[in-house]
Swiss-Prot record:
Keyword annotations of the record: Hydrolase, Magnesium, Metal-binding, Nucleotide metabolism, Nucleotide-binding
Gene3D superfamilies xref list: 3.90.950.10
Catalysis: reaction(s): XTP + H2O = XMP + diphosphate + H(+); dITP + H2O = dIMP + diphosphate + H(+); ITP + H2O = IMP + diphosphate + H(+)
InterPro entries the record matches: dITP/XTP_pyrophosphatase, ITPase-like_fam, RdgB/HAM1
Residues involved in Mg(2+) binding: D68
Organism classification: Bacteria, Bacillati, Mycoplasmatota, Mollicutes, Acholeplasmatales
Protein name per its UniProtKB record: dITP/XTP pyrophosphatase
Positions of disulphide bridges: none
Chain segments annotated as coiled-coil in the UniProt record: none
Native source species: Acholeplasma laidlawii (strain PG-8A)
One annotated Gene Ontology cellular component of this protein: cytosol
Gene Ontology biological-process annotations: nucleotide metabolic process; purine nucleoside triphosphate catabolic process
Length: 200
């Protein structure tokens, strides 16, 4: 099954491709829409994932997959939330520094990564799946692997950040992995819709 990857984010593509490829699902990444054309006006991760997937499916008349993800920190919930990528407005490193600064006098450092995956068909049909990864915010930036908030996020049961644990651990345990697992569990329903309804 071929699905358009509805994002320009190379890191997300690599992570999702490694998870989906063994299941005979091929991500097509050479389909691009100027991000300025897609207004992520949703108030939830699910809504924004649906907006992106629907835009690509409609433009290219093909099934599209999109994700919207971020981190929710209990002490300042619902932030950074859907604003995770642009929390500081100055990129990943400054986002992380801002979080550490906001939490410096707070005991509660619990946090969770959230990922919403949306599969959209050109006819408007959409399937959505959510995954979470629980953990805590570190006291300092640690590790150079990964991207986003990985250098300050310590998964439950670990002492290292995702930035230290690396891609092998993340591929198996991340919020994106959990969301994609939920998608894969429902894969037959999606394939049936593709074969017997949309392609009819």
């Amino acid at each position: 099954m071929d699905i358009i990857f509805a994002s320009n984010n190379y890191h997300k593509f690599i992570e999702m491709e490694s998870i989906l490829k063994p299941h005979q699902i091929t991500l097509l990444k050479d389909f691009q829409i100027d991000e300025k054309e897609i207004i992520e006006s949703g108030l939830t991760f699910e809504a924004n994932a649906q907006i992106k997937a629907r835009a690509f499916a409609k433009r290219f008349n093909q099934v599209a997959i999109a994700d919207d993800s971020g981190i929710i920190i209990e002490a300042i919930s619902p932030l950074p939330g859907i604003y995770s990528k642009r929390y500081s407005g100055l990129g990943d490193t400054v986002n992380n520094i801002k979080v550490l600064d906001v939490l410096k006098n707070k005991e509660n450092r619990q946090a969770r990564f959230v990922c919403a995956i949306a599969i959209a068909f050109p006819d408007g049909k959409i399937f959505t799946y959510v995954g979470n990864m629980l953990g805590n915010i570190a006291l300092n930036l640690k590790g150079s692997m990964g991207f986003g908030y990985d250098p300050i996020f310590i998964p439950d049961g670990k002492q290292e950040t995702l930035g230290e644990l690396g891609s092998t651990y993340k591929d198996e345990h991340s919020h994106r992995r959990h969301a994609l697992n939920n998608f894969l569990e429902a894969k037959d329903e999606i394939i049936d819709y593709w074969r017997y309804t949309w392609k009819k």
